[in-house]
Amino acid sequence: MSVKGKVFKYGDNVDTDVIIPARYLNTSDANELAAHCMEDIDVDFVKNVKSGDIIVANKNFGCGSSREHAPLAIKTAGVSCVIASTFARIFYRNAINIGLPILECDEAVKNIDAGDELEVDFSTGLIKNLTKSQEYQGEAFPEFMQKIIDNDGLIGYIRNR
């Protein structure tokens, strides 16, 4: 599976409280969550994000409170994947469980800028920066995790077994 999209770039320690602020956690409606995705760190994110776009961030993306709402808001907003130097472990698992592809690749993060267009192949972990004609090698998912992503998350994976 591969995706192509424009980059929205963020720094270190983007926590779940800025991905989806706690004031919106009284709903589990994915569309309502998506309407407020990233608003405390990027007020124009929801207005500017297009289906297929990609979030790139530095280290420890998704730190803070353990909330499945955070990757769900990102995915429902139209983001096709998140690339970071590192992810908070609980966010990493929550993202996989809801079917949001994520890749760790420090080299890519250091060289990618906001607005760059990327193409990402999850089966190989290859990240192509189409704007700069550069390629970076991220770590591909193990086969069982790729199957979860391919089935739109853990629930879809279990249903289709």
Swiss-Prot record:
InterPro entries the UniProt entry points to: Aconitase/3IPM_dehydase_swvl, AconitaseA/IPMdHydase_ssu_swvl, IPMI_Swivel, LeuD, LeuD/DmdB_bac, LeuD_type2/HacB/DmdB
What EC identifiers does the entry list? 4.2.1.33
Q: In which pathway does it act?
A: Amino-acid biosynthesis; L-leucine biosynthesis; L-leucine from 3-methyl-2-oxobutanoate: step 2/4
The record's keywords, sorted A to Z, are:
Amino-acid biosynthesis, Branched-chain amino acid biosynthesis, Leucine biosynthesis, Lyase
**Which CDD domains does the UniProt entry name for this protein?**
IPMI_Swivel (cd01577)
Q: What is the taxonomic lineage of the source species?
A: Bacteria, Bacillati, Bacillota, Clostridia, Eubacteriales
**Molecular function (GO) terms listed?**
3-isopropylmalate dehydratase activity
Q: Which organism is it from?
A: Clostridium beijerinckii (strain ATCC 51743 / NCIMB 8052)
Q: Catalyzes what? A: (2R,3S)-3-isopropylmalate = (2S)-2-isopropylmalate
Q: Name one GO biological process term.
A: L-leucine biosynthetic process
**Protein name stated in the entry:** 3-isopropylmalate dehydratase small subunit
Q: How does it assemble?
A: Heterodimer of LeuC and LeuD.
Would you say which domain of life the source belongs to?
Bacteria
| Xref: NCBIfam families | leud, LEUD_arch
Q: What does this protein do?
A: Catalyzes the isomerization between 2-isopropylmalate and 3-isopropylmalate, via the formation of 2-isopropylmaleate.
Q: Describe the family membership recorded for this protein in Swiss-Prot or TrEMBL.
A: Belongs to the LeuD family. LeuD type 2 subfamily.
Where do the coiled-coil regions begin and end? none
